[in-house]
Amino acid sequence: MNVAGYISLLVILSLLIGYLFGSIMFADVASMILKRNVRELGSKNPGTTNSFRVFPKKVAIAIGFFEIIKSVIPFSIILLIYKYGLQPELTKLDPSVINKTYYLTYLAPLAAIFGHMYPVYFKFNGGKAVATTAGFVFVVSPWWFLIIALTWWTITLISKYVSLASIVCFIIFLFLPYIPWLDYLWWFSLDKITFLTYQSDWYIIVFFAIANTILSTIIIWKHRGNIVRLINKQENKITKKV
């Protein structure tokens, strides 16, 4: 197989594994087990926030955890496939191609996010993917994760509006790729502190800029109902149970 073949294989595996894993809706799984349909109660959204309204707290926490790691797990699988399967073969063919392809492993968590929003197992009717995107943020950069996590928790604790915290975070998320010293792809740089630069890594910055723009646009659009309710002061707080 040539270089193009291995790169195509990496892209296909990343998209396929990420999407299929992301399509697992843990709130729906809990609904089946507990006989309490998350899609018919509260905001009717099969996500983490509504799970706190519908299910016992421990169950909701578990759902939130699994929603986060369901973008981390496919990335980890693809990372192992890349490092121990594809990278050695690519190195034999053209060592210079490694620095131009490794970031494609991040297609896996991106596909997981779209799997959550449009799950094949649930007729493409999914959630808003806030928690699943948090997993993507975590595997991209600890600095991204720290900024987003602190912002989200601060706004949520003060306002009690998870939707408001999420919307603000995705506005910030939109601009993070344009600050290169925050783009620390730590899974590939565990031995030293490093970051991307416009001079040598511009195509990776463009990759994440496009990805973040698409995600922010779609997820904020999915919150359009929340925005209207926030403006009209009709939005439910996280503390409200059903």
From Swiss-Prot:
The lineage of its organism: Bacteria, Bacillati, Mycoplasmatota, Mycoplasmoidales, Mycoplasmoidaceae. It comes from the Bacteria. It comes from Mycoplasmoides gallisepticum (strain R(low / passage 15 / clone 2)) (Mycoplasma gallisepticum). Belongs to the PlsY family. It catalyses: an acyl phosphate + sn-glycerol 3-phosphate = a 1-acyl-sn-glycero-3-phosphate + phosphate. HAMAP family: PlsY. This is Glycerol-3-phosphate acyltransferase. Its EC number is 2.3.1.275. It is found in: Cell membrane. Pfam families: G3P_acyltransf.
